[in-house]
């Protein structure tokens, strides 16, 4: 379980124990150590305490400017990052891409130059092209936080998923975690595989063959302790955590699925399938949920669902990332 401080003194003690952070940018979790993941979890516990106070704000990043640069639509992630920045007293520069010079053909690097000229200390970036945040990180003095790039990565989502699990389970070591859905097009799945495997979880991926990354089959192992199943009953059996993934219809080429109804028939997590998991299994989803496609309504709104908790915890995780990347020692 993650620690949440009870007093200001405990807050200072917990943060003083967070040492050795080396990341200027957060691009994915493949280059994070287990110890660094633990640092994020511990810091997020402090931030969650701040968010539970009557005044949900501290001056840790007062005087800093955080820009949000989203080339794709977003409600949860963008709002979560903005609230996280404001909770740390940072100024937020929200660039509306559709109404900016980007719509006139301005390049990504030119846009980043403009944001830095305006004083941005950090840039939260979502882009449809995999690798775009890496290009930005090599170009900018500002810290870059990847809020999702193409099919590649969504590190803050994976971190909040880990944090949410640890609010309910004592550790991830040995936990059986099943991810069901569009693995091929899911940046959430890719970052979760890295993060969860580093924390010692045993991961099962479940999807139709056409929605698995190319080159995989049921005998493949692409990460330590990761296996692949195309039968949802086998995949869910004995699981401690079951995570549905959104069917990425906007990213798919025609012909990957015979139809949405057929997908739901064979890969929807419903109450009957969920009974195969452990009685205290958690149900998760990065959102937005296509109800009665990936998850049945009864599962989405059932007692085992922690989907809304994931949203709440996302703010704490993003506060932690801002705090750690800024190098701040104040809270």
From Swiss-Prot:
Transmembrane segments: none annotated. Signal peptide: none annotated. One of its GO terms (biological process) is amino acid metabolic process. Keywords: Pyrimidine biosynthesis, Transferase. Pathway: Pyrimidine metabolism; UMP biosynthesis via de novo pathway; (S)-dihydroorotate from bicarbonate: step 2/3. Coiled coil: none annotated. GO terms for cellular component: cytosol. L-aspartate binds at residues 104, 187, 246. Carbamoyl phosphate binds at residues 76-77, 126, 154, 157, 287-288. Belongs to the aspartate/ornithine carbamoyltransferase superfamily. ATCase family. Catalyzes the condensation of carbamoyl phosphate and aspartate to form carbamoyl aspartate and inorganic phosphate, the committed step in the de novo pyrimidine nucleotide biosynthesis pathway. Heterododecamer (2C3:3R2) of six catalytic PyrB chains organized as two trimers (C3), and six regulatory PyrI chains organized as three dimers (R2). This is Aspartate carbamoyltransferase catalytic subunit. It comes from Dehalococcoides mccartyi (strain ATCC BAA-2266 / KCTC 15142 / 195).
């Amino acid at each position: 379980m993650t620690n949440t401080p009870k007093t200001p003194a405990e807050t200072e003690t917990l943060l003083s124990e967070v040492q050795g952070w080396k990341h200027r940018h957060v691009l994915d979790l493949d280059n994070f150590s287990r110890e660094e993941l633990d640092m994020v979890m511990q810091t997020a516990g402090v931030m969650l305490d701040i968010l539970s106070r009557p005044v949900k704000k501290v001056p840790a990043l007062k005087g800093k400017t955080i820009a949000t640069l989203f080339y794709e639509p977003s409600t949860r992630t963008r709002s979560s990052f903005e609230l996280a920045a404001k909770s740390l007293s940072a100024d937020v520069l929200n660039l509306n891409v559709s109404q900016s010079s980007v719509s006139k053909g301005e390049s990504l690097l030119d846009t980043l130059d403009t944001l830095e000229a305006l004083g941005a200390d950090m840039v939260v970036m979502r882009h449809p092209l995999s690798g775009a945040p890496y290009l930005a990180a090599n170009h900018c003095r500002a810290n870059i936080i990847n809020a999702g790039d193409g099919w590649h990565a969504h590190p803050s989502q994976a971190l909040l998923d880990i944090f949410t699990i640890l609010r309910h389970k004592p550790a991830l070591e040995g936990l059986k975690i099943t991810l069901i859905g569009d693995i091929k097009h899911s940046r959430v799945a890719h970052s979760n595989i890295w993060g969860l495997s580093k924390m010692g979880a045993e991961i099962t991926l479940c999807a139709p063959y056409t929605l698995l990354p190319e080159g995989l089959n049921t005998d493949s192992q692409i990460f330590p302790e990761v296996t692949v199943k195309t039968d949802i009953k086998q995949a869910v059996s004995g699981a401690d955590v079951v995570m549905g993934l959104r069917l990425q219809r906007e990213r798919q080429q025609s012909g990957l699925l015979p139809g949405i109804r057929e997908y739901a028939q064979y890969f929807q997590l419903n109450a009957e399938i969920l009974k195969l998991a452990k009685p205290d299994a958690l149900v998760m989803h990065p959102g937005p949920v296509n109800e009665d496609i990936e998850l049945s309504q009864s599962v989405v709104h059932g007692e085992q669902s922690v989907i809304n908790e994931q949203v709440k915890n996302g703010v704490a995780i993003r506060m932690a990332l801002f705090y750690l990347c800024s190098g701040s020692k104040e809270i």
